[in-house]
Amino acid sequence: MSTGLFDFNGTLPVMGLQVVLLSWLLEQILYSPIQGVIQKRQNKIQQELQLAADQLQKAQQLTQEYQTQLQKAREKARERIRQVQQEAQTMMEDQLKQAQQQMTQLFNEAMQQLEQQKQQALMNLSNQVDEVAKFILSKLMKQ
């Protein structure tokens, strides 16, 4: 009988067997199910990460498409504004030309009327001068 740390009697193999049996039982009852749950959780996390990455890629693609469409819409709006401004400028120039033509026409008509009135006044004046001259001449002749 030895009182050392390790006694090689029947208890040592039984304890070894108990450790092996307990390890096997823990593996079957506790570790394997926990590893299964952990593996399922990791798989679920991986799937969710993949889904999130796919959705992020889709969102980025949609964002790019919307930005492209927005840029095209802005370009169309700028072009339309330019066209409207050009049309307004052309319309304004046309109206200005038309107004100038009307003013020129009115001026010419007024000048013609003034010329006619001048000619009429000169004729009346000439007639009156002739009448006065005839009157004076007739008075002078009577004397």
Swiss-Prot record:
GO terms for molecular function: proton-transporting ATP synthase activity, rotational mechanism; proton-transporting ATPase activity, rotational mechanism. Keywords: ATP synthesis, CF(0), Chloroplast, Hydrogen ion transport, Ion transport, Membrane, Plastid, Thylakoid, Transmembrane, Transmembrane helix, Transport. It comes from Cyanidioschyzon merolae (strain NIES-3377 / 10D). Belongs to the ATPase B chain family. InterPro entries: ATP_synth_b, ATP_synth_b/b'su_bac/chlpt, ATP_synthase_B_chain. Its main location: plastid. Pfam families: ATP-synt_B. In plastids the F-type ATPase is also known as CF(1)CF(0). It is found in: Plastid, Chloroplast thylakoid membrane. The chain crosses the membrane at residues 12-31. PANTHER family: ATP SYNTHASE SUBUNIT B', CHLOROPLASTIC. GO terms for cellular component: chloroplast thylakoid membrane; proton-transporting ATP synthase complex. F(1)F(0) ATP synthase produces ATP from ADP in the presence of a proton or sodium gradient. F-type ATPases consist of two structural domains, F(1) containing the extramembraneous catalytic core and F(0) containing the membrane proton channel, linked together by a central stalk and a peripheral stalk. During catalysis, ATP synthesis in the catalytic domain of F(1) is coupled via a rotary mechanism of the central stalk subunits to proton translocation. It comes from the Eukaryota. HAMAP family: ATP_synth_b_bprime (MF_01398), ATP_synth_bprime (MF_01399). It is a single-pass membrane protein. This is ATP synthase subunit b', chloroplastic. The keyword Thylakoid applies. The keyword Ion transport applies. F-type ATPases have 2 components, F(1) - the catalytic core - and F(0) - the membrane proton channel. F(1) has five subunits: alpha(3), beta(3), gamma(1), delta(1), epsilon(1). F(0) has four main subunits: a(1), b(1), b'(1) and c(10-14). The alpha and beta chains form an alternating ring which encloses part of the gamma chain. F(1) is attached to F(0) by a central stalk formed by the gamma and epsilon chains, while a peripheral stalk is formed by the delta, b and b' chains.
